Amino acid sequence: MDQTPPARSEPLVSGIRTPPVRRNSKLATLGRIFKPWKWRKKKNEKLKQTTSALEKKMAGRQGREELIKQGLLEMMEQDSESKACSPKEGSQPAQSEPSAGEQETLTSEGVQPGSPSASGTDQASQDELLSSDAHPDDTAKMSSASSGEEADAGNLLPTTDEPSQEALSGSLDSPPRTLERSASQLPSPPLLPTPPPKASSKATKNVTGQAALFQGSSMKNNEPVLRGQLPTPTGSPHLTTVHRPLPPSRVIEELHRALATKHRQDSFQGRECRGSPKKRMDVRLSRTSSMERGKERDEAWSFDGASENKWTAAKDSEENKENLILSSELKDDLLLYQDEEALNDSIISGTLPRKCKKELLAVKLRNRPSKQELEDRNIFPRRTDEERQEIRQQIEMKLSKRLSQRPAVEELERRNILKQRNDQTEQEERREIKQRLTRKLNQRPTVDELRDRKILIRFSDYVEVARAQDYDRRADKPWTRLSAADKAAIRKELNEYKSNEMEVHASSKHLTRFHRP
């Protein structure tokens, strides 16, 4: 079966984005370190892989002819015919017995020319002729029941036209023909179910009772094939679609995916809602109210259309399961992709550290325990006013005892710890110190006296000093040019000084270095 993949998955695979422009911020280097455009590239590669895998799956779906060759559709026809003819043959009174020709005209009118199943009318009419010849009483009962139901439906729903009623009768008379419709011939149903009106549910109670006869055999034989969401047998938009239970592995995968997306959304939305507890409570209340409304709506739909949708649930999911899986996976990927983009932008622009700091402060302030909690955890002891007064009195008594044990002033003076001083005595002491210092300064010896005593010996006393005008720093002077004899005399003088005049410790004499003669 040549069928192109759904057009919804094509524009979602975007090209690789260029790296962001450098910003003059403190955390501009984080963008170059983490390289978020590489994350986007990896995400796009994953999206491409998933879309290619889904395209392969859709390309590998089997057609109607292959299923007939394998014998699956013939088995379903036989089981449905045997189940439809056997139970409760005499329960409904026969009002009219239409002939095979009238039944053929009804079924040909029931198949609309614009419907996808109009191509197989010849084969379906032959099957109906065989079944009507074999069981004329059953066909009469079924046609009379369907005509009565059409009358009731016409009274309840005046907007419904004749072709829809004929399609209803045709679908009831030939249930195997609805099973033979392939996935390529059926239009894709809407992904979200619409609530059915009560009038249509009342009008089709008898229809669902007969459709339940075919449900047992068809569901038992086609459980691995039929799964998920299926179209209605009449093709009318008023009858809703119901999801059949998926296998446990698929359910676990979808649960994990839903939990991951919910965690990401809560983490990003919680940052805005944490600041104001009132806003957070409003969000929780609105979320719980919406969940309760959704549960009530689901329960109403399930009670109204449970019996009529069991027959339609098996086939529609087989036809649309790839589209459903594709849409859910792409939604999750888009959410994760948008979250990563927001995180990368916040890292590059420098807003993430500020948000984290504010969140940490808010969390610390929010998690501060109250006085009651501290008392409950026995960290802050519970005390009454009387107990507090007693504790204060005990502390006062301890302080008064310590103050009474302090020594008196007389005792401190006697121990020479505290000295009584007057201004006159302090001035006299200062005057004595000044006189002593002046006397010492006046008695200082002069430079000549120090030289005589050989106490003050400066560098200028034993070195010839030249005046600044006569001194030249350049070394190319005749008295700086030493000959070999002058150098030898200098070395000899140094050796004599070291050996005779220089005092060296006996243990370190061997370390004295002499110059060569």
Swiss-Prot record:
Output one GO BP term.
actin cytoskeleton organization
Which parts of the sequence are annotated with region: Disordered?
A: 1-24, 41-247, 260-320
Which spans does this entry mark as compositional bias, Basic and acidic residues?
A: 54-68, 260-300
Entry superkingdom:
Eukaryota
Q: What is its main location?
A: nucleus
Keyword entries, A-Z: Actin-binding, Coiled coil, Nucleus, Phosphoprotein, Protein phosphatase inhibitor, Repeat
**Subunit comment:** Binds actin and PPP1CA; thus inhibiting the protein phosphatase 1 (PP1) activity.
Record's protein name? Phosphatase and actin regulator 3
Q: Which gene encodes it?
A: Phactr3
